[in-house]
Amino acid sequence: MGLKVIQQNVHKFLQLRFWGWWKLYNKVKPLLNVARQEEEMKAKEEELRKAMAQTQELVNKVKELEEKTATLSQEKNDLTIQLQAEQENLMDAEERLTWMMKTKMDLESQISDMRERLEEEEGMAASLSAAKRKLEGELSDLKRDLEGLETTLAKTEKEKQALDHKVRTLTGDLSLREDSITKLQKEKRALEELHQKTLDDLQAEEDKVNHLTKNNSKLSTQIHELEDNWEQEKKIRAEVEKARRKAESDLKMTIDNLNEMERSKLDLEEVVKKRDLEINSVNSKYEDEQSLNSTLQRKLKEHQDRIEELEEELEAERAMRAKIEQNRKREAELLKLRRELEEAALQSEATASTLRKKHVDSMAELTEHVESLQRVKSKLEKDKQVMKAEIDDLNASMETIQKSKMNAEAHVRKLEDSLSEANAKVAELERNQAEINAIRTRLQAENSELSREYEESQSRLNQILRIKTSLTSQVDDYKRQLDEESKSRSTAVVSLANTKHDLDLVKEQLEEEQGGKSELQRLVSKLNTEVTTWRTKYETDAIQRTEELEETKRKLAARLQEAEEAAETAQARAASLEKNKQRLQAEVEDLTIDLEKANAAAAALDKKQRLFDKMLAEWQQKCEELQVEVDSSQKECRMYMTESFKIKTAYEESLEHLESVKKENKTLQEEIKDLIDQLGEGGRSVHELQKLKKKLEMEKEELQVALEEAESSLEVEESKVIRIQLELAQVKADIDRRIHEKEEEFEATRKNHQRAIESLQASLEAEAKGRAEALRLKKKMETDLNEMEIQLDHANKNNSELVKTLKRLQQQIKDLQVQMDEDARQHEELRKQYNLQERRLSLLQTELEEVRSALEGSERSRKLLEQEVVEITEWHNEINIQNQSLLVVKRKLESDVQRISNEHEELISEFRLTEERAKKAMMDAARMAEELRQEQDHCMHLEKIKKNYEVTIKDLQAKMEEAEQLALKGGKRTIMKLEARIKELETELDGEQKQHVETVKTLCKNERRLKELVFQTEEDHKTNQRMQALVEKLQNKLKVYKRQIEEAEDQANQTLARYRKTVHELDDAEDRAGMAETALNKLRTRHRVAGKGITSV
């Protein structure tokens, strides 16, 4: 089979040697192997040196064996001489035996002595172990004592912690009492303030009474004037008299109320005096408790000092644990201290319980006082409210006489106008809300469709990119494997030719050696027949022909020696030739197997190459299509982003509009409240105004409900918009992550484009975050605005109360004028800030334009890269055409490529086990070195035995000669014995020689295996180093890319932070300006209302 394959290959080589591609391959092949030629030459030279050394060793061994055979023949002649000395040796052996018996007796006596010594040492060891156990028991007792001391220490520490806890509880109770005292003092201050307020109210009421008396005097003058015009104006006089009577009745009622208030004032003063007495008593109790607390703290300090002393004593105990007597004394002291601590704890508990009782009693008294004060306070507040209601009624009755019906009608007209405006604004808001809802639904639908399409395109792109990367990696691997296999195939062909030549030579040598061996065997058989014939002759004619027998025996011995030497040399040569033959056959089989595998792998690789070329073309087309889709989807994404930004701006404008509507609604509500107050002042038109009031309240409630609904719907819309924004941000994050992954796979071709896209994505994310941050700040500002509006409402109420008195109102007007000046100044400052922010915004816009220009540059670079990709694809198509021309050559290598791919997978799986194999190889090497050492020892032993046998052979030869001399006398028995002995020795010598040859073979095998293992370990180490270097390179590249990404992100974050800051400052400035303007408008309206009230008064 191997010969057929070789013949086929030679035939194909002769056919294809003039083929153009084969010439090109022969020209290119040395260039590929130039880097490895020197290494291969060195390896071959080393192998040649090793082979030469081995052959030299074999030649030396053959020479040594020849010399040994010569020496053996000489020793065989000397055996007869040694036979004489055998008897002397036997005597010497008997003497040695006697000596050995004596030495045996001596050794037995020494053994008995050693046993006695051993028993003594065992007794000593037993005593030592008993002492050790005793010491261990003492040590365990000491440990138990130590543990008891540590438990006592832990108990004392626990008691100390309990005391600390009690002290803390006592201090907590004291702090609670102090808090209760502070609360009482605060309530006292509140009562004093309430008392002062009631006094101020009384003063105000007295002022009002004076004012009423003045009004009464004015009315009396008017009555005098009306009496003069009695006849002309009867109706007017009757009304005036009614009003006068009503005013007089009201005056009487106010005077009665004033008297009652004076009485309540006296009662309040008495109550305040009582409370002062109670507070003094509470203060005295507090002082007593403080003194008690100080005594307790002193005791606590004493206990703490005592505990510190105990801790110091305990530390001294730890230092003096070895002294048991002192420990007992200290235990007694500890018991005393425990008793003292328990007594102190009992005392402290008793004092704590007394303090708790006192505290509970004082708290109960204080609660009773507080409840009584609260009751008084509620009573006073009720009286105050009654007085206020009566005063308001008096004021209303006095003002209704002076005011006319025209004011009420004018106010009603104003209310109707404001209500119509509010209804129009509400209708506009509803329309805006409906438009926003429609836009939102449309955007949600478009967003969902876009996200779905984008996810599908991303998934397809991911799959394509994965397949492309895997295919490119497979192509590279196959190309590399194909190159390696072509190299290995060429080397295998060369080595196969060499081995064939060597095999032919070895076969010729083997045939020659076999012929020589057969001739030697024939000669040996001939000699054996001659020996047997001469032996028979010798047996028959031994007595008669002793001289002839000696001569023939000598001749036979010489011929036998020559034959044995020739046989041994032939056997050695035959063994070496068989070894060479087996080795060469094994190498030839391995090479043929490798060649078949290489052919199979090459064929498989050729098939895979064709399939891969088709798949690559298809995937390139798909990749281009997907690239177009990705570009279109990115454009659409940008369009939708712009639309979403527009919607956001529209939404923000609607929110601003809603806030302005809310503010107007609040102003309208304030005006409605003012009008309701004014409507209550009408005299005759009270019922009409009440009807209008009810109507307005109903409309106000309806407006409030509508506003609440609008606010709730707006809140819902805001939450939906925020959720949409979050979903958009999440989608953006997913898109960015996927794009980032895909661009990492296209690192080699699209680095610049990747960086630009990543920076833009980071800027978009940062912008979205900035938007979210701005919305959050906006909400915060809205809450602050609401709080400010609430505060303004409270201020408005206070102002409405202060308007009643003219002095306070004038002072307030002055304050407001000052505030207006400050607001104007702040407004100017805000204008300046706004101008600054506009400048900053223009700078940011320039920066954005620069970023856009950079993006356009990246787009241009991307287009250039795409053109390069197109050129590469064209070049790849040309290479594919060239590859198709090489398919004929690759078909032969398919089987080899398949085998190599399988081996590659096996190597990948076995790569993890290389270190274990290396360890095993090292262990095998150590074991083989040990075996080699043992074999060397065995060889040395065999050589010693051989020398002994040589000596014995010499002795036997000497004895044989003596026996031959005594053959005439001794007869046949001695000759038979000596010949049997010679045969046994010869067989033993042959067996030892065979064993020696086998040991040499095993040594060679072990050395070869050791070299292979060492070579394998070195290759595994090199592959590991290469893999580590590759991993380090990849890690360095990753670090560089990460650093570049981080720098780009930092730059983007800085620019976005500047942009956010400017936007935030601009929004703040606009909000402050709006707030200032609204405050100015409110102050102006209030100023107008106050001016009208003053003019009317």
UniProtKB/Swiss-Prot annotation:
Stretch forming the signal peptide: none
Organs and tissues of expression: Specifically expressed in muscles of the head including temporalis and tensor veli palatini.
The keyword Transmembrane is assigned to this record: no
Highest taxon listed in the record's lineage: Eukaryota
Coiled-coil regions listed in the entry: 31-1087
GO CC annotation, single: myosin complex
Keyword Nucleotidyltransferase included in the entry's annotation: no
Protein keywords: Coiled coil
Gene3D superfamilies: 1.20.5.340, 1.20.5.370, Myosin, subunit A
Pfam families: Myosin_tail_1
Function: Has most probably lost the function in masticatory muscles contraction suspected for its homologs in dog (AC F1PT61) and apes.
Family: Belongs to the TRAFAC class myosin-kinesin ATPase superfamily. Myosin family.
Full protein name: Putative uncharacterized protein MYH16
Organism in which the protein naturally occurs: Homo sapiens (Human)
Upper classification of the organism: Eukaryota, Metazoa, Chordata, Craniata, Vertebrata
Gene symbol of the encoding locus: MYH16
